[in-house]
């Protein structure tokens, strides 16, 4: 079963201007918020039976892995560690290598694109990807990562992966260890849905991660990389300062349509209380 949500309120001309070719890179945000996020009622936010041909289905697989299914049947898995999610194998997998739970050295044969988020070839200083398969375009923005063997940084050791589908821009922060620069934000462009690690330790402190959310200004946040209700409760408390709504669905999947994005910043805990 898939959790389907629909927003009755129209987003207005500003969001109409954001529309572009489905496979184009995400344009910059045209709506800028001040401190926090503009207040908008979620009255009318409900789970509906109507389907859109532009729906994108995002399913929480576990830990930092999400399965993304496009209208044309392309399937991607984020932070792929060898677990194929639900059903058939993916067409595209993206990986980061902060820990073994975020990648595999032995991906299943037949995956069309296997994209590492770190330099993995001799002489390579950063991973750079830009691939398109049917209605999904995927590229990455390299960021630094801590060297767990010491106090130094692994330059370009992590990647934020962006998935452009059906005029939606979805970003997965990977194992992010620092705030973003203007250059990072320019490369990211407009992000509608943001997958965010909220462990508060292995990646970065939770207040700092909330700062990153403020930098990116998504419409929807999907928490990941947490273990138990306590971390979610703390994250919910911090996000309250941004006047965000918090939704606890009873399923692992959410159906997202660009034209039905909420006006107000919304956190959807598709990983449930356990996360993983």
Regions found by a protein language model. Name each.
Residues 224:
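A Lys-centered signature of the CheY-like receiver
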Residues 19-146, 168-173, 192-196, 229, ...:
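Metallo-beta-lactamase
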Residues 89, 216-217:
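Short, structured coil segments at secondary-structure junctions
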């Amino acid at each position: 079963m898939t959790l389907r949500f629909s927003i009755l309120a129209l987003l207005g001309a500003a969001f109409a201007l954001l529309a572009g070719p489905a496979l184009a890179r995400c344009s910059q945000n045209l709506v800028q918020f001040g401190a926090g996020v503009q207040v908008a009622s979620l009255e009318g936010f409900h789970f509906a039976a109507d389907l859109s041909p532009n729906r994108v289905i995002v399913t929480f697989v576990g830990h930092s892995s999400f399965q993304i299914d496009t209208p044309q049947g392309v399937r991607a898995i984020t932070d792929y560690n060898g677990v194929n999610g639900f059903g058939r194998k993916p067409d595209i997998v993206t990986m980061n290598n902060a820990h073994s739970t975020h990648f595999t050295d032995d991906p299943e044969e037949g995956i069309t694109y296997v994209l590492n988020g770190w330099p993995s070839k001799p002489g390579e200083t950063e991973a750079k990807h830009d691939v398109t398969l049917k209605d999904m375009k995927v590229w990455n923005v390299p960021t630094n990562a801590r060297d767990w063997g010491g106090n130094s940084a692994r330059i370009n050791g992590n990647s934020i992966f962006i998935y452009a589908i059906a005029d939606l821009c979805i970003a997965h922060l990977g194992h992010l260890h620092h705030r973003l620069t203007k250059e990072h934000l320019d490369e990211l462009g407009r992000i509608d849905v943001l997958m965010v690690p909220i462990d508060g330790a292995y990646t970065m402190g939770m207040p700092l991660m909330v700062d990153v959310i403020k930098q990116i200004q998504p419409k929807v946040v999907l928490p990941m990389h947490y273990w138990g209700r306590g971390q979610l409760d703390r994250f919910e408390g911090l996000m309250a300062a941004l006047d965000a709504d918090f939704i606890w669905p009873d399923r692992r999947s959410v159906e997202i349509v660009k034209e039905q994005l909420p006006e107000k910043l919304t956190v959807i805990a598709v990983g449930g209380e356990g996360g993983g």
